[in-house]
């Protein structure tokens, strides 16, 4: 694959490889290596498994506090009204960080009473993750990471899940 996993921790690599071996029903490392040489599908599955998708809303509290208190207010104040404020979130995984950043920007734009159009672009090398993010449906467990005020403003409650409101998804 075109991905470089050389900086991953050995334990992480080993666990992910062992997981794929178990799923493929292969017991030996040599046997799995042979499968990887011959089966591009298995190579892609392993690469996808190695891509770490650890994410949740407002995951790094200190970083999001800094963004919300110092950086985003400054960007909002400096933004001219004749063009949109564009933000790119690379490596968005399933969207939680991208939506978290979007919420912070929309809150600051409202607090500053500025008529700024916000455009957030989120990308990831995993197309399935991007599709998940685009749908914006998350389990009830996000209540642990998202304040009730933000849940009410930025989400629609479904049966056992929350969906990000259209304003944020688009």
Describe each model-derived feature in a short phrase.
Residues 82-87, 98, 115:
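Active-site lining segments that contact anionic ligands and/or coordinate catalytic metals
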Residues 59, 93-94:
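Glycosyltransferase donor-binding loop in the core domain
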């Amino acid at each position: 694959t075109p991905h470089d996993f050389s900086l991953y921790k050995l334990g992480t690599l080993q666990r992910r490889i062992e997981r794929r071996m178990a799923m493929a029903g292969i017991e030996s490392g040599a046997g799995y290596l042979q499968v990887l040489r011959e089966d591009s599908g298995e190579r892609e599955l392993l690469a996808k498994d190695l891509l770490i998708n650890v994410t949740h809303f407002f995951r790094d509290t200190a970083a999001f506090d800094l963004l919300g208190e110092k950086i985003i207010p400054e960007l909002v104040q400096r933004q001219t009204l004749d063009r949109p404020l564009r933000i790119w979130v690379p490596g968005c995984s399933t969207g939680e960080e991208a939506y978290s950043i979007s919420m912070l920007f929309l809150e600051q734009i409202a607090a500053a009473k500025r008529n700024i159009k916000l455009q957030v672009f989120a990308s990831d090398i995993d197309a399935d993750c991007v599709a998940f993010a685009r749908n914006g449906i998350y389990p009830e467990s996000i209540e642990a990471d998202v304040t009730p005020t933000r849940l009410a403003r930025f989400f629609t409650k479904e049966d056992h899940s929350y969906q990000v409101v259209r304003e944020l998804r688009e």
